[in-house]
């Protein structure tokens, strides 16, 4: 039986340009038109990572709910956590339209949005009004015209400290000129020192230590991975998110849309991002939490991220093609896979294919 959303998406939503369709989906979630997912909690999926308890390992990645409009509605779809943003100190419009492109044959998306968002103040007001206890992370970035990008990240920590369950410092978007330069070792050391000092200062004031993750690109050299791992362990960071979108266009079927500039996400990113994830797990060791992102489209691909070294996983682009039922289907599917593997917890399967993925081509 064909999923009703897929019929609607291909015949309805896909008639609209991607950015308009995205706005319609946010409106539908706000209005309650999208039904909540009914999932029986599975204690085998529950885990504590970076001091936070996650009911299941599946999260909504940053980029969908940029302005913190629907975090609780997303959690009701079955996600174990969600991440708002990327949010910058001041509002900014991002890059000119069109700036999102569907590659339907590839089940992929190319975007060059450029951190379009309403700024810290608007997102903070919405997060302050939340009544639920779900895990909502805040992805922070820098304004395109900022004269001191590190100061922008520090401002994000200070602004959202009372409402964030965790932070993600996004230094890996390819759509803000020069942003990925912050992944270079000297720049990264300065960034992490400043961000973690701000976090520690706020923790001392509030009595709550909020974990900080770093989101990295998949387009890294081996030396680049070495540098990030070394700095993550030296400071120390609370975790990594692997990975953001890629500039690679290798193996795409839709060569017309592939020519668009921007970051590629969706199914074609799975192999590359999972290989980088495994390489980073090898570098940072067993203790540092890692969230795996890129091409998660099913329970099987979510579990494969975990087998490659992830503690948690996130998705976004694949929901464009699979619809709002995807998170619930994945969570239920993970329970079924644990049955098949006769595993007592999802944690038991982490790293079980680490060597395989670490040896794969990046």
UniProtKB/Swiss-Prot annotation:
Membrane topology value: Peripheral membrane protein
EC number: 1.3.5.2
InterPro entries: Aldolase_TIM, DHO_dehydrogenase, Dihydroorotate_DH_2, Dihydroorotate_DH_cat, Dihydroorotate_DH_CS
Keywords: Cell membrane, Flavoprotein, FMN, Membrane, Oxidoreductase, Pyrimidine biosynthesis
Major enzyme class: oxidoreductase
Gene3D superfamilies: Aldolase class I
Record-linked HAMAP family: DHO_dh_type2
Family: Belongs to the dihydroorotate dehydrogenase family. Type 2 subfamily.
Protein name: Dihydroorotate dehydrogenase (quinone)
Source species of the chain: Rhizobium etli (strain CIAT 652)
Organism phylogeny: Bacteria, Pseudomonadati, Pseudomonadota, Alphaproteobacteria, Hyphomicrobiales
């Amino acid at each position: 039986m064909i999923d009703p959303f897929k019929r609607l998406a291909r015949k309805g939503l896909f008639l609209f340009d991607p950015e308009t369709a995205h706005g319609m989906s946010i409106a539908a979630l706000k209005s309650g038109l999208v039904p909540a997912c009914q999932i029986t909690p599975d204690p085998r999926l529950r885990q504590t990572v970076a001091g936070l308890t996650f009911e299941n390992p599946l999260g909504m990645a940053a980029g969908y709910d940029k302005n913190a409009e629907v975090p609780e509605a997303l959690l009701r779809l079955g996600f174990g956590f969600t991440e708002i943003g990327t949010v910058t100190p001041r509002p900014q419009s991002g890059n000119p339209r069109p700036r999102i492109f569907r590659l339907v044959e590839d089940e992929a998306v190319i975007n060059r949005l450029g951190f379009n968002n309403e700024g810290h103040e608007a997102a903070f007001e919405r997060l302050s009004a939340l009544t639920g206890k779900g895990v909502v992370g805040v992805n922070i970035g820098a304004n395109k015209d900022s004269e001191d990008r590190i100061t922008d990240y520090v401002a994000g920590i200070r602004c959202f400290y009372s409402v964030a369950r965790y932070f993600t410092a996004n230094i890996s978007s390819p759509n803000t000129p020069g942003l990925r330069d912050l992944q270079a070792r000297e720049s990264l050391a300065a960034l992490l020192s400043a961000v973690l000092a701000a976090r520690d200062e706020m923790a001392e004031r509030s009595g709550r230590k909020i974990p900080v993750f770093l989101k990295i690109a998949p387009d890294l050299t081996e030396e680049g991975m070495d540098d990030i791992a070394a700095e993550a362990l030296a400071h120390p960071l609370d975790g990594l998110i692997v990975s953001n979108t890629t500039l690679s266009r290798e193996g795409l079927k839709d060569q017309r849309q592939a020519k668009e500039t921007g970051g590629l996400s969706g199914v074609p990113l799975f192999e590359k991002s999972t290989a980088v994830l495994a390489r980073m797990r090898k570098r940072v060791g067993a203790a540092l939490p890692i969230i795996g992102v890129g091409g998660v489209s099913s329970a099987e691909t979510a579990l494969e991220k975990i087998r490659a070294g992830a503690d948690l996983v996130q998705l976004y682009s694949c929901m464009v093609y699979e619809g709002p039922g995807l998170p619930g289907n994945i969570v239920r599917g993970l329970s079924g896979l644990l049955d098949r593997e006769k595993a007592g917890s999802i944690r038991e399967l982490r790293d079980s294919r680490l060597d395989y993925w670490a040896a794969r081509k990046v």
